[in-house]
Amino acid sequence: PGHDYKYKNFSQKQITSIIDLSKNLKKKYKIKKENILGHSDIAPLRKKDPGEKFPWKLLNKKKICLWHNLSEKNCKKFRGIKLKNSDNFFQLLFKFGYKPTNNKNEKIKIYKNFQRRFRPQLISSIVDQETYIILKSLV
């Protein structure tokens, strides 16, 4: 079930299936790992799925999708520390590929979906230094 229905961890069977399917589709259609996206990457104002419990990091280890190469231990010390200038973050986020907006509520939705994908340990509306460091490593 999704976020509105007691969002649960993906089963091992689901994870194995998505790995096998993704590998086959990548090979068949010559898809680059940068182009493997979730609903929330494409429509972050409307979608949250696949969400923070989706195994993006594992899929990256299987050479399926994009993930940052930073250690959680090194990044964690910046978690929750508010970024002084969030405009820099959003300029970089829009450069990364998210649709630009000046609407504050839309920016927060986009930001949270970026966190669901690349920093799933904490989903927050505070634009923090850890998320900025992760984004910088991807752009």
Residue ranges and their predicted role:
Residues 7-8:
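Feature activates predominantly on carbohydrate-active enzymes
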Residues 28-38:
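Surface-exposed patches in mature extracellular/periplasmic domains of secreted proteins
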Residues 12-30, 45-139:
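Cell-envelope/ECM-targeting effectors and their regulatory/trafficking segments
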Residues 1-4:
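Residues forming anionic-ligand binding surfaces in small-molecule and nucleic-acid pockets
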Residues 41-43:
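Catalytic metal-binding/acid-base residues of hydrolase active sites
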